[in-house]
Amino acid sequence: MLSLIGFIITISILVFIHEFGHYCIARYLDVKVEEFSIGFGKELIGITDRKGVRWKLCFIPLGGYVKIYGYDSSTRIIDKTKEVNEEVTFYSRSCLARFSIVAAGPLINYLLAVIIFTSFYCYFGKVEIPPIIGDVVAASPAERAGLKEGDKIVKVNNKYVKDFVDVQKEILINGFSSSTLTIARKSEEFKVNIRPQEIIISHPEKKKIGKTFRIGIIAKNEPIHTKIGIFGGVLEAINTTIDISTLTLKAISQMILGTRPLDEIGGPISIAQESGKSMASGAQMYLLFIAMLSINLGLLNLLPIPVLDGGHLIFILYEAITGRLPNPKTRNILLQLGAVIILLLIIISISNDIKNLFY
């Protein structure tokens, strides 16, 4: 029950923030908004404000939308079946204005994450764990490579690392491919190649809930705490957001290239489970979960897939460069292709969720 409640609350928060970004910029640019909906299907409750916007909560809490006057949100074209006041429609605005309206949704998701991370950095400070090995897991890739307690990791794949998080990040970015670690041991410095080992994450009832990989090293538990102000907190929050986005993009590219398994894609059941776990762990963990999910929502919406915000941004850029709208037939084909891609991702994610529930 907590997972279901957590899922509904989490999705509602993220969708509201995302659509509110579209709404705010549309209103700022004097584009009329007809509806602001959380959920799909039959309206459960709603109110119309003095500007004529219908704010409503619908039966199926799996998303939401902002309906802009004279603009069909599913096809991204002017609705010719009804009379419209061209002065306040989406397409009456310049390419830059329309680009701003579309981009505002994903960007406000990023802004939410930065605000949450900033508050954590300002309140708790920055914690760094030096990249010094405290222990090596038996029979792990690290042990086979000859790593020992007390070794300091200087570089991973020729990139300098200043703390253990950097080590984890670089190894994650490289996926299941081998990583080259530069190790400092006493006065000696040498390199080792390590290929991560796949491990199964199991539920206490022995049900598999996912896969990950490790090289088998444990950090020496000597964290360094540093207090930082608001400016430093913002910078750290931005860096954290960029790091998470980079890891996500790398994972997506590896899945496309076939070097990373598709069973890592989680769907609504996974989100519900993680929502419930984070809520049960307290407000701090739940806020961090919201921030992580908000980054992923913003990033995925920016992917150049037709029907997503990113695909529509490509259409606007095409118009800005060529001076003409994309060919309607070509546009419709691309929209249908985009819908198929999204449908396939939904099927894969739900299949993974079901498989992880029973196997």
UniProtKB/Swiss-Prot annotation:
Its EC number is 3.4.24.-. CDD domains: cpPDZ_EcRseP-like, S2P-M50_PDZ_RseP-like. One of its GO terms (biological process) is proteolysis. It is a multi-pass membrane protein. Keywords: Cell inner membrane, Cell membrane, Hydrolase, Membrane, Metal-binding, Metalloprotease, Protease, Transmembrane, Transmembrane helix, Zinc. GO terms for molecular function: metal ion binding; metalloendopeptidase activity. Zn(2+) binds at residues 18, 22. The active site is at 19. Its main location: membrane. It is found in: Cell inner membrane. Residues 104-188 form the PDZ domain. GO terms for cellular component: plasma membrane. PANTHER family: MEMBRANE METALLOPROTEASE ARASP2, CHLOROPLASTIC-RELATED (PTHR42837:SF2), REGULATOR OF SIGMA-E PROTEASE RSEP (PTHR42837). Belongs to the peptidase M50B family. This is Putative zinc metalloprotease RP161.
